[in-house]
Amino acid sequence: EDYKMSNLPEVKIGVVAVSRDCFPESLSVNRRKALMKAYTEKYGTDSVYECPVCIVESEIHMVQALEDIKKAGCNALCVYLGNFGPEISETLLAKHFDGPAMFIAAAEETQNDLLGGRGDAYCGMLNASYNLKLRNVKAYIPENPVGTAAECADMLHEFISIARAIVGLSDLKIISFGPRPLNFLACNAPIKQLYNLGVEIEENSELDLFEAFKKHDGDERIPAKVKEMEAELGAGNHKPEVLPKLAQYELTLLDWIEAHRGYRKYVAIAGKCWPAFQTQFGFVPCYVNSRLTGMGIPVSCEVDIYGW
């Protein structure tokens, strides 16, 4: 199985415009349309969704927008202040949305229309950030969050990577095989902080792994896996005699992942490769670790749970 897709979070950002009722709603809506046009022209239509609901100082609008982006399959949120914005309902949206949220705002396009075209979104961002803190809502605010449609499109695109990391962490299980080697305190994982990030961890002993490896002796899938490795290594296959054991180990880890992922979508492995690994397993696991990483399964060694 190729884990490059299944083990990598797909991000879909719901873009929700907001408006304060003493400003024209059309100002926010038109600026949202300009933002989406700028985004799709530069980055395409993937990863973003334009919510048709503009929140106008209304908790009911907030609920409507929330339901709409959920229905559209969004797992990340961009609150776009087209004008000053309603600090209560816009921050409630971020509070009730189950996923990463970003707040950005529209700069004034011109000095020529200060009656109908003035939005004061910069000031609105100040109020929004203050209200987010009051509610203990964590949201991403770029260093310069107020910009033109093109600048905000770039911010939206940059948010994809941030959102992907947060979405991934919230549905990640780290499978570890330890304990850590002697004198490597840096590899000692503070489990509490992993839980604080929303990460699950399954800690196993090296002996558990060794038992599972032994149970894969004579696995009928080993010859096919060896051929796969031979084709990949080509002229670099200087130790053909060790390939069956490496194939057995790779199958052990892949089977372990599927048997132990539980309810989590994404999996990473923190393994151990010394000092007893080489003498007991009969090989070093670096090649298998790199193959798994190439498949889309991150693997660290030395039980480096928190560092990878």
What residue spans do the PLM features occupy?
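Glycine-rich anion/phosphate-binding loop at the beta-strand->alpha-helix junction
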Residues: 264-308
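Metallocofactor- and cofactor-centric catalytic cores in central/energy metabolism, strongly enriched
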Residues: 3-167, 171-175, 180-270
